A protein has these predicted regions:
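An acidic/histidine-cluster motif and surrounding catalytic segment
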Residues: 1-63, 67-173
Length: 173
């Protein structure tokens, strides 16, 4: 998806001032972006991949253009815990409070750590490299339809997606 090929959506993320979402009670802060169409295009790219994951009924890996592998990826066993999606990306330099994010993780699967007040959406570091299951893809599509469209890294947050994890050691940066 590019800014030229975006389709109309119910974009509810603020572009001017900070708000509290009436549907989630989460504090939403506008992103610093020159062209909001690029933010919408990125959200639509992830959305299309979530749709593909759900229709294929197979887990998929989603990689953004800037994801760089630092070692060979091996799919992690998720049957022992209820993992809907997990990041494989090193948070350092990829998200806000990235050092705190990294320092709160141990080897293996980790819930997305709290690095800010709990009313601020907190999700995968950079949202640029993750594995998602079909049931989680269906869940996030439903949430987006109900809440409205947000940037993909905000809608897929710990507060809305209890099935969100981070895997360490990381495979990408």
């Amino acid at each position: 998806t590019t800014p030229q090929t975006i389709f109309p959506v119910a974009w509810t993320w603020p572009t001017g001032k900070k708000i509290t979402c009436p549907k989630t009670n989460l504090f939403l802060k506008p992103y610093k972006t020159y062209d909001n169409h690029k933010r919408i295009a990125a959200a639509q790219s992830h959305f299309r991949l979530w749709q593909m994951c759900a229709s294929m009924n197979e887990p998929i890996m989603i990689l953004e253009h800037d994801a760089l592998f630092t070692k060979k990826f091996t799919a992690q066993e998720t049957s022992a815990i209820l993992v809907g999606a997990y990041s494989i990306n090193d948070p350092r330099g990829a998200t806000f409070k990235s050092k705190d994010y990294h320092n709160n993780l141990v080897d293996g699967f980790n819930k997305v750590p709290w690095v800010a007040p709990e009313n601020i959406p907190q999700g995968l570091p950079g949202h640029s490299a993750y594995v998602i299951t079909p049931w989680a893809a269906k869940d996030i599509i439903e949430k987006q339809d109900r809440i409205g469209w947000w940037p993909n890294d905000a809608i897929m947050c710990r507060q809305l997606c209890e099935w969100l994890y981070v895997y360490k050691p990381y495979f990408t940066k």
